[in-house]
């Protein structure tokens, strides 16, 4: 995997091309990602680059975190993220304290975006797994949205792991692959990505160059 950026999902809008065709896009604000550490195989067992972005109130920063940020010479951020490196040449010219901006995506056409999906709470099978509903009438009284059978008989005598049933929906990490990068707005530090991205407005997303 290569170096990406950490950003904030702003919301959705649309842009028009020269022919007047509308394209729905999600706006991601990418404040400069500050490098806090560059890891290598000799000292850490793997090659990676560690970054932070945004800011955090001084009272919320623990002493170990404060020391880590001070060693890198950067302001304390909202958290720490790592990008593992397959090619160590990507970090040439970079060092702790350097910044990664949206300019990194000037020559990128397709990206992968990771985020945490919206939480939906406890949901039934119809909403959570798109189960078909049972008959609305004709003798059906209380099982309109019931899932039906969840297993077999005395053999195997249990419910298989992973059986689709009612339960907690959403609030999981999800990556959407191969999204078109419509525009890179360097002046305003924005990425305009075609389509929807996982997560709510204001949530943190990770944008990388597409891997396949």
Curated annotation (Swiss-Prot):
The PTM N5-methylglutamine maps to: 154
Q: Describe the processing and modification events after translation.
A: Methylated by PrmB.
- Supply the alphabetized keyword list: Methylation, Ribonucleoprotein, Ribosomal protein, RNA-binding, rRNA-binding
Cite the Pfam families for this sequence. Ribosomal_L3
One GO term describing the cellular component:
cytosolic large ribosomal subunit
Q: Which GO terms describe its biological process?
A: translation
Organism domain of life:
Bacteria
The record's GO molecular-function terms, alphabetically, read: rRNA binding; structural constituent of ribosome
**Signal peptide stretch:** none
Q: Which HAMAP family match?
A: Ribosomal_uL3_B
**Subunit structure, as described in the record:** Part of the 50S ribosomal subunit. Forms a cluster with proteins L14 and L19.
Q: Report the family membership.
A: Belongs to the universal ribosomal protein uL3 family.
NCBIfam families named in the record: L3_bact (TIGR03625)
Q: Describe the task this protein carries out.
A: One of the primary rRNA binding proteins, it binds directly near the 3'-end of the 23S rRNA, where it nucleates assembly of the 50S subunit.
Protein name per Swiss-Prot or TrEMBL: Large ribosomal subunit protein uL3
């Amino acid at each position: 995997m290569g170096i990406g950026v950490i950003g904030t999902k702003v919301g959705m809008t649309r842009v028009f091309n020269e022919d007047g065709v509308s394209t729905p896009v999600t706006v991601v604000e990418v404040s400069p990602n500050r490098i806090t550490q560059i890891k290598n195989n000799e000292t850490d067992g793997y090659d990676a680059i560690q970054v932070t972005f945004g800011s955090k109130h001084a009272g919320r920063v623990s002493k170990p975190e404060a020391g880590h940020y001070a060693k890198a010479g950067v302001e304390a951020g909202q958290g720490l993220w790592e990008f593992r490196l397959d090619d160590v040449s990507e970090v040439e010219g970079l060092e702790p304290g350097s910044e990664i901006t949206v300019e990194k995506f000037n020559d990128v056409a397709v990206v992968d975006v990771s985020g945490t999906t919206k939480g939906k709470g406890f949901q039934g099978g119809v909403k959570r797994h798109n189960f078909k509903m049972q008959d609305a009438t004709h003798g059906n009284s209380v099982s309109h949205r019931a899932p039906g059978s969840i297993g077999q008989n005395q053999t195997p005598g249990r419910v298989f792991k992973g059986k689709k049933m009612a339960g907690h929906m959403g609030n999981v990490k999800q990556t959407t692959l191969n999204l078109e990068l419509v525009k890179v707005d360097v002046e305003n530090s924005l990425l305009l990505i075609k389509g929807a991205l996982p997560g709510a407005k204001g949530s943190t997303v990770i944008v990388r160059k597409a891997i396949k």
